Amino acid sequence: MASRDLRAEVDFVLLQLLGDLEQLEAKRQALNARVEEGWLSLSKARYAMGAKSVGPLQYASHMEPQVRVGTSESQDGLQKFWMVRAGTQTPEEVGSREAALRRRKGLPRTPEPDSSPAPQNPLKWFGILVPHSLRQAQASFREGLQLAADMASLQSRITWGQSQLQELQEKLKQLEPRAP
């Protein structure tokens, strides 16, 4: 009876693993399409504005990231990745500010300036009126970043599923008597 339950669990984990692999392949194809679309839109923008108008010479001297990758690990060791826009606070950052002492009496303090103001839109490096294709390129690459984070989470889940499947198969081998 235990062997039957173990086989059912192996089947469930295997089906889940195959579903995750199918999702990963679909996301890879979508990522490839977004990146290809982004580069094509970027080349259209270079054609519209001139080859020297869209290039490294227009980049800001000091760049700030617009997104970060957030990670978390669940109790079973499964990691999850997601995109966090710059300027938004994570729960850890909010909690640390509230724990600070407050001065209730005396001179009013001047508010502390934010150490990290929201970063400027990089499209403004290329002028005020940028072609629509440049905006499309930016949107395509942003979607690609989100897909990459989703793919990393899926890959982590696939690795976890493979280890679960191997453990279950080892248990199943120990339960079944060896036939000559």
Swiss-Prot record:
<keyword id="KW-0175">Coiled coil</keyword>
<dbReference type="GO" id="GO:0030137">
    <property type="term" value="C:COPI-coated vesicle"/>
</dbReference>
<dbReference type="GO" id="GO:0051082">
    <property type="term" value="F:unfolded protein binding"/>
</dbReference>
<dbReference type="GO" id="GO:0005793">
    <property type="term" value="C:endoplasmic reticulum-Golgi intermediate compartment"/>
</dbReference>
<keyword id="KW-0967">Endosome</keyword>
<dbReference type="GO" id="GO:0005768">
    <property type="term" value="C:endosome"/>
</dbReference>
<feature type="region of interest" description="Disordered">
    <location>
        <begin position="89"/>
        <end position="123"/>
    </location>
</feature>
<feature type="coiled-coil region">
    <location>
        <begin position="152"/>
        <end position="176"/>
    </location>
</feature>
<dbReference type="GO" id="GO:0005783">
    <property type="term" value="C:endoplasmic reticulum"/>
</dbReference>
<dbReference type="GO" id="GO:0036295">
    <property type="term" value="P:cellular response to increased oxygen levels"/>
</dbReference>
<keyword id="KW-0256">Endoplasmic reticulum</keyword>
<keyword id="KW-0458">Lysosome</keyword>
<protein>
    <recommendedName>
        <fullName>Vacuolar ATPase assembly protein VMA22</fullName>
    </recommendedName>
</protein>
<comment type="function">
    <text>Accessory component of the proton-transporting vacuolar (V)-ATPase protein pump involved in intracellular iron homeostasis. In aerobic conditions, required for intracellular iron homeostasis, thus triggering the activity of Fe(2+) prolyl hydroxylase (PHD) enzymes, and leading to HIF1A hydroxylation and subsequent proteasomal degradation. Necessary for endolysosomal acidification and lysosomal degradation. May be involved in Golgi homeostasis.</text>
</comment>
<dbReference type="GO" id="GO:0005764">
    <property type="term" value="C:lysosome"/>
</dbReference>
<dbReference type="Pfam" id="PF21730">
    <property type="entry name" value="Vma22_CCDC115"/>
</dbReference>
<dbReference type="GO" id="GO:0016471">
    <property type="term" value="C:vacuolar proton-transporting V-type ATPase complex"/>
</dbReference>
<dbReference type="GO" id="GO:1905146">
    <property type="term" value="P:lysosomal protein catabolic process"/>
</dbReference>
<comment type="subunit">
    <text>Accessory component of the multisubunit proton-transporting vacuolar (V)-ATPase protein pump.</text>
</comment>
<feature type="coiled-coil region">
    <location>
        <begin position="13"/>
        <end position="38"/>
    </location>
</feature>
<dbReference type="GO" id="GO:0006879">
    <property type="term" value="P:intracellular iron ion homeostasis"/>
</dbReference>
<dbReference type="GO" id="GO:0070072">
    <property type="term" value="P:vacuolar proton-transporting V-type ATPase complex assembly"/>
</dbReference>
<dbReference type="InterPro" id="IPR040357">
    <property type="entry name" value="Vma22/CCDC115"/>
</dbReference>
<keyword id="KW-0968">Cytoplasmic vesicle</keyword>
<dbReference type="GO" id="GO:0007042">
    <property type="term" value="P:lysosomal lumen acidification"/>
</dbReference>
